[in-house]
Amino acid sequence: NTMGISTPIFSPTGNIKKSANDLAKYMIMHSQLGKYEGGRIIPKKLSQQMQAIISEEEGYGMALENTTQLIAGKTMIGHTGSAYGLYSMLFFEPKEKIGFVVISNGCDTKTINGFNAVLHQTVNSLYNNLIR
């Protein structure tokens, strides 16, 4: 691993070190604009701001990305992560109420449309075999 490449100089995880289950809860909360299990976790306006595109070139808002490059025909909102041989992503489509959290270990750096190839293929396999 090269400092600043596979692990940014500051915390590579934004100091979020969570399980797949915890990431799924975070994803559900954002897909419901700040609500989770009937309670408000963050203000609706804040969740909307975090999801709003600030950088048109990259599709990023404040921590969350909008992309059409993950699943064909879908605009997904989410975030990727990588550090020390771990690759992860959480992405959701709020209108259809679908979402994915995928975590993998390894050092495969191949990409598809800018996403780790293993994660991209896994999300598409889950979508095609379980949802579509």
Where are these regions (language model features)?
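Catalytic loop of the DD-peptidase/beta-lactamase superfamily, centered on the K-T-G motif
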Residues: 1-132
